[in-house]
Amino acid sequence: MKLHTAITLAALALTASVASAQQGVSKDEIILGSIQDLSGPLAGYGKQTRNGMMLAVDELNEQGGINGRKIKLLVEDSGYDPKKAVLAAQKLVNQDKIFMMVGHIGTAHNMAAMPVQFEKNVINFMPLSAAREMYEPFHKLKYSFAGAYYDQIRYATPKLVKEKGLKKVCTLYQDDDFGLEVLKGGEAGLKTLNMTYAEKTSYKRGATDFSSQIQKLQAANCDMVVLGTIIRETIGAIGTARKMGYNPVFLGSSAAYTDLIHKLGGKAMDGFYAAMTSQNPYTDDASQPIRFWSNKYKTKFNEDPAVFSVYGYQIITNFANAANKAGKNLTTESFIKVMDTLSIAPDIFGSPAQSFSPTRHLGSDAARLSQIQDGKWKPVSEYFGDDVKAPAGKAAKK
């Protein structure tokens, strides 16, 4: 009888131990998952992000990992399809048993995948989307580092209008949730100047001909155009305008802040402004730390890094920062406890300081302007945003 009781108690103890074990964390390893576009329209971004993450993971593992645990990064391809993103999330969460989802790319894709993660208490950490849904409504498992497209344009539009004495502001935007965020941000910014858009025109996702839209903006004598565009559409719209001899001030969001704009669009892209938070790294950058990092990346992957490489690197670095502070007993709850009081200092890429709290999971809404000059992005403003106005060390409440 005593033997039977002892065996029963041992079995119960083992069951309790297994039940309380943290998914994705073992004695020697932490498993992270990421969903990227590796085969669709944003494959360039996805591959750069993956490489940046891999560089950070390799560096951390070479240094002994996090409290003795090595990081294992699993990356799935969504092809930039929200339905595939759900399948990828199901695989990573339910089969691979990841501890956390890191740097998932795409707004609709994150929205589709988050319910799968949250059902298993898996954090959505610093997704590659600047949509407000990445941190609103508040959820304990959502953490974002990207200020919203809406806020970027809300601040940048009146800034340029005042600096350049512009009279007629118009917009060309993608007819979807992303484009509408940019549209609304511009409207809110113009409202502070008692102005409204002089003209609005849109295009369907995948469009390649922008001649009718540009003609409409030119006919309205717009001297500034807010672009709710990403890569191909930014190049197409500006390129079309240049050919027509139409040269307003063009402003885009961080979605258009990529070296692909000037690499693919050429000289015609000079003068284009975009909001940004981290500098695009160049191997001949004036900053020695950026130059060193860029060349290290190029040596490893045999290609130049880009700003999405930086995002991937930052996301893993930020995860490691918090996970280290959570100590040996790394769980979702211990990680949240650290994150909810965490401050992150500016890094070599010129990113703004970030801070999180138990009621605010956006690190910073700050952004600044960069402009393409002589075929390269150059920062041309200080940071702006609600957080910049907040007292030192305190993020503005949302």
Kindly give the residue locations of the regions a language model identified.
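Acidic/histidine-rich, surface-exposed loop or edge segments in extracytoplasmic proteins
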Residues: 33-41, 274-275
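Extracytoplasmic ligand/sensor domains, especially the bilobed periplasmic-binding protein
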Residues: 83, 97-201, 249-274
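Segments of small-molecule ligand-sensing domains
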Residues: 300-309, 320-377, 394-398
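Short glycine/serine- and small hydrophobic-enriched flexible loop segments
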Residues: 37, 58, 317-325
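Hydrophobic alpha-helical segments within soluble ligand-binding/sensing domains
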Residues: 85, 144-168, 207-211, 234, ...
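Extracellular/periplasmic periplasmic-binding protein-like sensory domains
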Residues: 238-312, 383-391
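Beta-alpha junction/loop-to-helix N-cap segments that form part of ligand/metal-binding clefts
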Residues: 25, 31, 44-51, 59, ...
